[in-house]
């Protein structure tokens, strides 16, 4: 098959053909226009979200992070965690083949699909989790003075925040149950005790 369509209808068909598939949603969170931004990766089943600081909102920066995750996790675990990725039609996600494939065997590492235009609700789980990021980094905030260590800290607090949909477990706990703490460590995640969680801008005040 020389060409595979990647629209939302194709995504739904893929899920129908692979009902046990775990879904990953991918998006960007923008700081000030023209400045640093985030790539967010949301594991829908466990509500765990990863976030990576990028100097610019480019396709190359997204591919670089996907390649890094592939290297850190190894091909087998990467493909287990990322069987299918749903994202939007932003220009930063405009090179699906580079996201889907690696240079070594097995070359195919994931399947990427796109939401319909102007339909962010189709990846609503990711959008809802962004609201927690915006509690710490309000809209209009500059990300230019932040480091990746700051972003890891922010996501540790968000991923340790217990959710009703997870039966009052945190995303960290839910993800650990399915995949183990070793994988979380490889992803740069650490737990935060409930009484120490801060979901306010002061968390990242220098």
What spans do the regions from the language model cover?
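C-terminal domain-tail junction helix/linker
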Residues: 97, 139-206
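Active-site beta-loop-alpha junctions of metal-dependent nucleic acid enzymes
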Residues: 31-34, 51-76
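RNase H-like two-metal-ion nuclease catalytic core shared by retroviral integrases
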Residues: 87-89, 100-103, 112-137, 144-156
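Structured nucleic-acid-interacting core domains from mobile-element enzymes and related host factors
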Residues: 14-23
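Short helix-terminating capping/connector loops at secondary-structure junctions
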Residues: 76-81, 107-109
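Acidic/histidine-rich, metal-coordinating catalytic segments
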Residues: 27, 78-95, 116-118
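Short conserved beta-strand segments at catalytic cores or DNA/RNA-binding microdomains
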Residues: 16, 27-29, 33-51, 66
């Amino acid at each position: 098959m020389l060409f595979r369509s990647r629209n939302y209808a194709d995504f739904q068909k893929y899920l129908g053909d692979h009902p046990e598939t775990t879904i990953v949603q991918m998006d960007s969170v923008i700081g000030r226009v023209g400045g640093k931004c985030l790539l967010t990766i949301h594991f829908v089943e466990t509500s765990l979200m990863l976030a990576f600081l990028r100097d610019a909102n480019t396709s190359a920066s997204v591919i670089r992070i996907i390649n890094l995750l592939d290297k850190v996790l190894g091909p087998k675990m990467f493909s287990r965690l990322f069987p299918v990725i749903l994202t939007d039609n932003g220009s930063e996600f405009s090179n699906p083949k580079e996201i889907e494939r690696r240079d070594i065997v097995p070359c195919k590492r994931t399947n990427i699909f796109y939401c319909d235009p102007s339909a962010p609700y189709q990846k609503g789980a990711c959008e809802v989790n962004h609201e927690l990021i915006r509690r710490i980094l309000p809209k209009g905030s500059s990300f230019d003075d932040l480091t990746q260590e700051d972003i890891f800290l922010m996501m540790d607090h968000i991923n340790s925040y217990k959710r009703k949909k997870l039966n009052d477990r945190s995303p960290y706990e839910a993800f650990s149950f399915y995949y183990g703490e070793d994988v979380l460590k490889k992803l740069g995640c650490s737990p935060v005790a409930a009484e120490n969680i801060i979901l306010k801008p002061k968390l990242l005040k220098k």
